[in-house]
């Protein structure tokens, strides 16, 4: 197991040199403590070299990963004596390590010590003053000159015959008050950096505390307790024991009675400031430390467990044991990282774009996946079906059966069509003649504009389906296609062009459907209500209204249909078994009689005008023969009388000849007055016959509109599916191949996105690092 620490060193070099952070949480010993507590002196004593920067205020401003590597040494007998980094026996290692720290024999051929920095790996430093200068320069380069700190570590390796294999991480000392141009939050920055390292489960905390201060105020122990409350991975170091007050000692602390730690405390005596100024050598400093513990009355009994050599040996053994304990977990974590990174790399795709034939295959596969995804989304066979909202073909179904149907059903068949409009159309369709029957021309004139109301929802339905297909097109690319932005854009544009091409005939066909319905009004359609059905509805409604009115007025209820002509023919019977059809049949037999009645009632215009002026209501009542006469044509005098209703007091011949005949108000009749009478003729209060005509037209329009609406609701989705949706599905594959599969397009379309390319290369680097780390661990585990 002697190679465990070098193994961790290799892993540290690997991860910091490639990734820049310890993603494996490698076992390490982290040195923490307050500013000027003696951390630097402890490290220099362990190394046996004076190499760390010194000064006032905060000096260590970046983490220093210090890797101590023991070099083999040769004796005069030319025997290779292996360094005692990780011996199987603690007794053997103790003797060897003590010798390593205290120097070598005078008769040995000393090997020159040297240092290396990870950021300049090809440079060896044999002068420790230059090492100190490089640490200062590198700190200044990254952390700046304002005494601020930086999390990027400095990796330093020291090769020496006087050291044990050991790795330590020196962190900035915790300071309370910023001095000079230090940031005002320097304490928070330092604390955050320290917590980042000591909170890792695989780190051993080396808490340095000065013995000449109360241990309960130790910042290092306070920080350690915050992450290791039971003290299982904290080892305490007491410095400056030689500076304690006379008559006092630290035996209670060293024995664990004051502040118990599982790993215990180790006492050290470092060089004082005067020793540093006088350039006291490390060998002399270690000799003075050993002499102090041997002759001190309180510490002489535990001298074997005090001093820098014992601390180095303890830390080395502790680190080896910690590595051995954590190595299986590290290997398992590494295996997980390799698997995850490999999966992530697979998601980015392993494209061999250098091979021209492979480029063609990649392009064809991308087009096939795009087309298949587009079709599957419409058919509902997509592998990624969302559960939170409708998508693909389900949205098309919703458009047809919810949006489109609701829009059509919400249209009023008589929208924008007033009673005056209907009456005017009826009058205009009859021309200058009186009407005998209900005008079919008026029905045609009125119903065609109403059918055109169906066009707008149909057009909107086509547009909505087109928009949904465009959305499906934009979401049809998979992760592999997204790696090539230009290819994805070309695929979307090609399919968009196809959809636009299919949109035009679809739009035209839907317009033709509306035009077809307006081109021929099929009143013989079996679902059309017809005149008889419309008459039944109108009469039924009038009867219901009459009954309701009679009940409100408490009048005797007698059927309004019990009307008998003067000749004794009963047209309307109160018998409920009498149908509208029988009534109509009776009415057709009377048409000849009605015509003769009309002839008999023809009178000169002036007489009619006089009669209407003198007794309009009695005349109107007298002219009513039967209710059917209002539908199939009464006497012609009714229409003629209405045409001169407003001007009945003016003899027409006198008015036109400029006579002096005046109205009862003595206003002369003018041509403009006659014109106004003609324009407002349709606005007059309608007779009962005219009301029936209007109601019949309304019922017929409503019936035919509903009939046409059902046809449109059924046919428009079929047209859209055939000409737009299915046509696009059938043609998408051939269109993509014919437009994009060209060798001169390969270089243009298969250009990877820079971000994707960068991420894939990063994954490849990570995977390489993980595999190398796994290979390193496999050498010993």
Curated annotation (Swiss-Prot):
Residues 23-328 form the Dynamin-type G domain. Residues 33-40 are annotated as: G1 motif. It catalyses: GTP + H2O = GDP + phosphate + H(+). The keyword Iron-sulfur does not apply. Its main location: cytoplasm. GTP binds at residues 33-40, 170-174, 239-242. GO terms for biological process: endocytosis; establishment of mitochondrion localization, microtubule-mediated; intracellular distribution of mitochondria; mitochondrial fission; mitochondrial membrane fission; mitochondrion inheritance; peroxisome fission; peroxisome organization. This is Dynamin-related protein dnm1. It comes from Schizosaccharomyces pombe (strain 972 / ATCC 24843). The lineage of its organism: Eukaryota, Fungi, Dikarya, Ascomycota, Taphrinomycotina.
